[in-house]
Amino acid sequence: MIRWKYELHSLIWLFLVLHLSKCQSDSLTTSAEQHELFAIKKDSLSPWSQILVSLPRRHPLYQSFAAKIQDVTENISDEVRDSNKTFVSSDDAPYSIRIHALRAGHRYSIAIHGQKDGSTSLIKEESVVMDPRAPDFRSMDSDIQVAEHNITMRTIKNDSYLQDSFSIEYRQINPDKKFPVLQILDIPEQKNLEFYLGNLNSGFDYSVRVIAHKDGMSSRPWISTLTTKPSPLKEVNINQNAGSCVEVSWQNDEFSGADFYTIQYSLQSTPNNSTNMTIPSTESSISICDSMLQGEAYQIIATVQKGGQVSEPLITKFQLRPLPPIDFRVRADLKRGKYKLLAELPTSSKIDKCQITVAGDEAERSVNYANIEQTKSGHKICWFNFALSPGERFDFSISSMANESASQKLQKSIVLTPAFDFNAFGLTLQESNGGIELIWPKSEVFMTRVKDIWNKVVGAESLLNMRITPIGNNDETDKTLKFETSPKNIDPVFAKNLVKGACYRVQLFTVTKTGIISETRHNETIRMSSPAVNVSLESVTRSSATLRIVFSTHHDSTSISNCQMHIVVRDMNGKSVFDKRMQLTATFAPLLNLDGLSPFHKYTVNTQIICGSGSSETPQCPAATRTMRQLSFSTRQDKPAAVQDLKVEPLNSYSVMLTWLPPALPNGILTHYAVNVTKIGSDETRTIDVGVSSNRSDHTVQVVIDELFGGHTYSFSVRAVTEAGFGENSPVVPTVSMPLMAPPVPTVAPMIMKESVGSHNMIVRFPTTMFDNRNGEIKQFAIIVSETTADESINRWIESDNGTYTWQQVQRFDVWPSYVAKLQDIQKVKQDVDVSIFEELGEDETCLEVRADRICNGPLRSASKYRVRIRLFTSPTLFTDSPPSQVMTTGSATPAIPLLTVVAVLIVIAFVGIVGTIFLFFWNRTKKARLAAAAFKNGPSKEKESQWEALKMMMAERAADCLAKLGLDATTPPPSSTTSSNSPTSTSTTMTDCGSNPHLGAPNAGGHRRTRSLRERTGVEHRLERLSSGPVHRTPLYTVVTGANTNKSRPVRIEDFADHVRLMSADSDFRFSEEYDMMRNVGVGQSVAASELPINRPKNRFTNIPSYDHSRVKLSNPNNIEGGDYINANYVPGFSSRREFIAAQGPLPTTRDHFWQMTWEQQCPAIIALTKCVEKGRDKCHQYWPDHENVPVLYGDIEVTIVAEKEFDEFVIRDIRLEKSGPDGRVTRFVRHWHYMAWPDFGAPSHPNGIIQFSRMFRHHLPHSPHNAPTIVHCSAGVGRSGTFISIDRLLQSSSFGDPIDVFGTVCEMRYERCQMVQNEQQYIFIHYCILQVLQGSSPSPTSTSTGAHHNAGFVQDGQMIVESGF
């Protein structure tokens, strides 16, 4: 069954195949896409290397097909024979098999096999000869050589290709010409193939076809168009026309073809720098006009091009003629005594030299050559000198030459004119004695030279002619004066009797004997001089003057009829006040009145006589002007105008500062000023004479008016005075109310009358001269009584030094503190009359019956010592205490202490001990709470503070009373803790807690409170003194400006500053200490990251003085080195700028170069040094400047030189030059070094005068900086002395402008920029004393205690104590 099915399937397939074959044969002619099954055909594109086998789409017997290839070529070697190959069908191309990589000309046997289920059967086998392949003459191994009449083609045959022969077909394209076909047999053993095509025409295109043949088959042809090389040009002709163009023509070979011609021309000297031109083959010439320079030597290279072939070049060299000279002229050369031919040459041509030919009637023809010169303006010239005779005719011919090629000639026939030069001949033409005179030179040597030149270029027989013709006067124009002269006769030529002021034209020229006139003439117009006049001052007043004008000599009217006088009068500012022209006549003698002049002004009179200014004058003859001698005069003085900008400013309660500017119109020399001072509300007026000198740059006059009285109002007027009298009153009459202040300190102390001293009373006497009303009228006086101890000190129980009690309030004390015994109004008394006042103390026996807070003059204690002082009042709050009287003891001795009193005292002492023990136990338990409360001002409440103060006061009072009764308070204090009794210091405090008069205070009879122990002050052991009372918050003093934020700023008006310092100094500078402690934490906690870098720590002199990051000075650091921009310095604000100063530490040896780098980069004009290099054996600052003057030292890249040095008592000033190399060269700057050496470390100078002088001198000499460059200030750490100096400088500037003085705010502001500025309390107090010293002038410096701390012993005025008043 299976076999039957297989045979049936084969029959069906055979039927289909036969049917398909019949269909394909039927449609073969109608469809190109139908292929015979398994057809073997050579590829149409590559018939020499590829065969294509067609396969059926679906074959019932085979699944795939393969084509086996075998090279069956006969008579070839095995090396040439191709290897066997097999190609199979693929899914990518299932309908054909492409056989490739076959060899041209080889015969191959191709067998097609079918495959199915592993069995293979041969389907078809056929033999095919591959087409031959023509050689490729464009390949790398090929070469085509083209000549004018032949072409040679060479290549290397491919060993694998087979051919029998080659045929070469070639023909000329245009015009068409056919050549015989070349047949060449192939020689297999010959690898190189060469074809030669001869008998060709030059310059034509040829079509070449090369075909390979094999077994009757021909290859596809190799086709190319080849061009023969054209023939070179036969000749090139070059013609230079009359212009600047060059005509280039050529002749080509008539049998040679050409597409275009190439012309390449260049200078023969620079053949590589050429210009190329392409010309169509239809042209045979070209013009070159712009690119060739006349006179240069050129070469032209001409070639013919056909296709890509170029003929042999034809080189032609030629020389262009230079351009002829533009023009020439012949002039006489007086210096050489010859005629000079000067030719101007064109710049657009090369010219080497000039050829000059000269011929005359009597002179032989001569040829000369001259070199070329170039003028400053860029023109080319040539010149030549000839020894020719003037007055004769000569023919000149000149041409340019370049490389022996001559240009066209420029010819002229010239008659040589005689020479003439007015200046060269040394002639002088001048007005003389009413005429015009021509003068020859006086020097014989010069005249010898003139005669020699005259004979050569003028002519020995030639003459000099002078013509003088009047101008502008019609009736005289024909009256020309003629004169002749020559060097043979050197007498002057004089034309006399000319009209004064008239204008004449003078002509000078030379003439030969043949009548030839010189080409050069001297023309000059001369106007005869004007008549002279004298101008004199006839009279002068304050506002007018009279001038008289007369002629110097007599003139007739005709000689001056055309002249005018121009007179101009100007004031001292150059402004014209009189300007007038007047016609001159023979009788001209006017008087000129000048009115409206200003008093005491200088005037100048300028007079000119102008002749020839009429309308009939010609512009050729300008007017003649004669200037007369200038006359000056001054008007008389007058009363001055009012002064300007009158201002008044009170200085204190009894003096003012009056300022004004001088009058705008002084109207004379000011002798003085009269100042009228009037007290408002009275007829009292006084006049003060003030000098006119002023040492200020703005000429402001300043005067201090004294002897005024506080509390009164005054008006001021100022008048300037000249010798003419008093000027006007000032338009503004300023008034000022004098401030009311505490009375001046009396110079005398009250005196207790010894004979009046009793057991309970005494009489005190004091003069009325202590009632000084300068600071205001004294309204009251009070008598202050103080009991003293055995050492004559005053009981200090009351907290305030100025606080006082009443008589009844002091009864509870064993030693009475100060109390007011009497308060009495003062009647007006004359201060210059010495009248004594007597007052009895202790006269009132009824004081126990009145209220305790009432003032009462109760009995004194017997056998007790007392001091008395007088308190003077200008108002209830303004008072001053006199010095205390001598100590006086009342009568009768103190009785013995009874036994019961001693027992009572012992009981009190035991009670005090028990209370103290209980308190100490409580103190230890609350220690932490107290420490926390002490860190803040707003800690414990005021109520607890008052309770604790009351407890301490009560315990100290009881102990003092007991010890006093036992006689244990008589211990003498150490010498260092006491001060003289006549120099106490007091403060103003209102005692509201003791019930005393709030307007009365008690003076402090002791010295500095901090230097005395509690036992010395109260008789109690010092251990009680150490008991803390917590932070005490004090309200700012009344002297601080109201409304200020007292946590950051405490400004004080200038007029209140003295009182402010006194109040701050009271109680041993307690308020100074309290205020300084408030700034302890200002600025603390700000970032100091740069200072704490490990690489920067060695750059800090002190580890606790870092540099704040936000304000530190940064050095330039171009290489970005870590820490390279760090220096321990900060910007600190001053008066004028936020960065007016740089506060820096004293340089270390390792930071010295950084210090100078900072100085250079910040462009600092000055350096302030406030420390010595070594103090007390310790290094405080490295010496960063050179040791010797004018010896440069290099610090880093900055050269430092001291150019000058000046020493003072306390400081040294050095001028230092800094030099540094930069991109623009070496840059030089100057820095002034201020070195103050009298300032101790951690302290203050002993006296402010030195540092004030130093600060003022620095500020006066500080140069102006256009960049607002900062000044460097340093000490050792750069905080203490540096901060103090900056504060002083800033506050002195502020006070000079009248601004409030804010020491507290200034220091706070600095501490925000650099830590610990103003390092201790002593320096803080010193700032106040410096400012006060400047404001008051006479105040002495603060002194120092034995411990070295700042000590305030009080201010001294007029040699006496100042006692400050309370609120």
Swiss-Prot record:
The keyword Oxidoreductase does not apply. It is a single-pass type I membrane protein. Glycans are attached at N75, N84, N150, N158, N273, N276, N403, N523, N534, N676, N695, N802. Residues 1072-1334 form the Tyrosine-protein phosphatase domain. Keywords: Glycoprotein, Hydrolase, Membrane, Protein phosphatase, Repeat, Signal, Transmembrane, Transmembrane helix. Its EC number is 3.1.3.48. Pfam families: fn3 (PF00041), Fn3_Dep-1_1st (PF24942), Fn3_Dep-1_2nd (PF24943), Fn3_Dep-1_3rd (PF25300), Fn3_Dep-1_4th (PF24946), Fn3_Dep-1_5th (PF24940), Fn3_Dep-1_6th (PF24950), PTP_tm (PF18861). Residues 977-990 have a biased composition (Low complexity). This is Receptor-type tyrosine-protein phosphatase dep-1. It comes from Caenorhabditis elegans.
